[in-house]
Amino acid sequence: MSDYCDNEFIESQEDLKIFGLRVRELRKKSKLTQSELAEKIGLSTNFIGMVERGERNTSVDKIFKLSRAFKLSLAEFFKTL
C-alpha cells in the first residue's frame, strides 16, 4: 500500500502540526513505537514520523486507520484538536 495519495485532508501548515502532535500523543499513550503503529495500520515508519512532525498531509482513509489503531471513534480522535 502506498503512503501517498491525491486526497489530502488537512489544509494549513499549522493544522498539520497540531494533527501531528495529536497522533504522537495518542501513540505514546498507547505505548506504541512509530514502527509498531506503522505496522499495525499498514504504512511506513517514515510516513508516521513525517505526520507527527507536521511534514506530511494525510487522507481521510489513513485518519480512519489511525483512529482504529488507537481504539477511538473519530469524534474521540479529534476531541482535543
Language model: regions and residue ranges:
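Helix-turn-helix DNA-binding elements, focusing on the entry/boundary residues of the two helices
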Residues: 23, 34, 45, 60-63
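N-terminal flexible/basic segments that precede or flank functional cores
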Residues: 1-25, 29-30, 35, 68, ...
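Short, basic-rich loop-to-helix N-cap that marks the start of a DNA-contacting helix
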Residues: 55-65, 74
